[in-house]
């Protein structure tokens, strides 16, 4: 195994561990030592990849953005905007059980980072911002002048259902909301 492959693997493990811990216990309470332990990386090696905790947080945000862009790219392969929007809604069901237990991984991170100052405070908005911009473009393709408002309503419905699923420890809230949102999308197209 080359040094580059080992480095990439350790870096990816650190990001994956941070994602999980940030979701389960929050960014601020999570220590770099906990991330290192979960990633099975010596604690001192964390600083080789990330000079500060903020750098690791930024890497987690970038990872979420990459996943979002990949998901949206897959949805763009569908033939028209309504199925794409419904696909976005259904895609969130993949995290329904997780959301019921710990809240939405993306929504929770965005809410927590929003309380930070500077670049880190703005970083969380990038994740949901990309998804909202994409949804707005889909509604525009449906000929809707209120596309921005509709995109916000869609994301509010998705994120709101994740919050309620967590509050009531009931993943079915998200699946019921997804069905409602799909009917709503049909009524708009």
What are these regions (language model features)?
Residues 62-68:
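Short, basic, alpha-helical segments at the C-terminal edge of helix-turn-helix-like DNA-binding modules
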């Amino acid at each position: 195994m080359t040094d580059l492959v080992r480095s990439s693997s350790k870096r990816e493990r650190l990001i994956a561990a941070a994602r999980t811990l940030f979701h389960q216990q929050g960014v601020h309470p999570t220590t770099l030592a906990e991330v290192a332990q979960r990633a099975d990386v010596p604690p001192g090696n964390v600083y080789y990849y990330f000079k500060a905790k903020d750098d690791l947080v930024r890497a987690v945000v970038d990872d979420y953005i990459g996943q979002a862009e990949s998901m949206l790219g897959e949805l763009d392969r569908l033939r028209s905007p309504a199925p794409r929007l419904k696909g976005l809604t259904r895609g969130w069901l993949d995290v329904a059980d997780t959301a019921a237990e710990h809240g939405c991984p993306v929504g929770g991170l965005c809410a927590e980072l929003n309380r930070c100052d500077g670049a880190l405070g703005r970083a969380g908005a990038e994740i949901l911002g990309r998804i909202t911009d994409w949804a707005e473009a889909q509604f525009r393709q449906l000929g809707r002048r209120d596309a921005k408002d509709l995109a916000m309503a869609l994301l509010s419905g998705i994120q709101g259902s994740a919050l309620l699923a967590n509050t009531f420890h009931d993943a079915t809230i998200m699946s019921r909301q997804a069905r409602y949102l799909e009917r709503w999308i049909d009524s708009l197209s």
